[in-house]
Amino acid sequence: MKQFSEPGSVPFLEFGGEGESLFFAHANGYPPGSYDVLLQKLAAKLNVEGVEHRPLWSESRAPTFMPWQVYARDLLDRIEESGADSVWLVGHSMGAASAILAASEQPSRFKGIVALDPVLISNKAWFWSRLFARLKPDAMPIVKRALARPHEFANHRAAFEFYRGKRVFQRVSDSVLMDYVMAAHVARGGEQVHLRYSGEWEACVYRSVPRMSGALKRLKCPMLIVAGDRSDVLSAKTLNWASGLNSKIQVTTLSGGHLLPLEAPQACAEVALDFIQSNK
């Protein structure tokens, strides 16, 4: 895994591999390195690159709101910079939604999408969520948690122990959790480490969840939604709604929650590779 960052360009990580190009878009708060196990499995068959979302590299303070189309355009910019012709997209959570937005904007660039527990909400749910966020931007429970999260730890081990006790990570292995800790925290003098993806940016992403129905309808490439059977983001009703919008959308489920690609990276990789192979 090699990291690349140049002025004026979207930063990315190379995970190696040969063959067709695959670009990965990560979830809110989880840098590409968090998914090392998953992406190394994919790199056994494809040339894999993880694109960093704007909260990891922007020098600007997090705004209250920012359209997710901005992250989609960043993804498109990185793909164009790479010189790749037609690529596969894999994304998790907001990264999967950003991938869908990107593919709906420039369909000729993409061979297919694997969306791992993507953020998809119906138009009605989106309306009420957006209204509440506009009226009380810091009142949403998920926003409150993001703004309250600690940003400093004595060292990486202290950060690991903190997260190890959190319910959200209870089905994530120690090794994958450490991948997240190392990817999401940077040293700042001595051993002390600082959170790279600030709570303010995380909250901005949560407040700005987009309406997705139009993008789903406009998809031209095949897409597989891989949902966790214990996901608190995707319900059976939502999956039925999404798959009913476009005949190119398939749905499958795996054992796990919203952090499915961290909880079951091997299973996610196998499903993704099978889908890619069947759509070549």
Can you say where each PLM-predicted feature lies in the sequence?
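A short loop-to-beta-strand scaffold at the N-terminal edge of the catalytic core in hydrolase folds
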Residues: 6-15
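Flexible "cap/lid" loop of the alpha/beta hydrolase fold
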Residues: 111-152
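Catalytic histidine-centered segment of alpha/beta-hydrolase-like enzymes
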Residues: 256-265, 269
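Conserved hydrolase catalytic core segment
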Residues: 85-128
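Conserved serine/cysteine hydrolase catalytic core
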Residues: 175, 184-244
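Conserved HGGG/HGGXW glycine-rich cap/lid loop of the alpha/beta-hydrolase fold
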Residues: 14-61
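Active-site loop/oxyanion-hole signature of alpha/beta-hydrolase fold enzymes
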Residues: 49, 53-90, 129-131, 270
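The conserved beta1-alpha1 loop
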Residues: 23-27, 92, 227
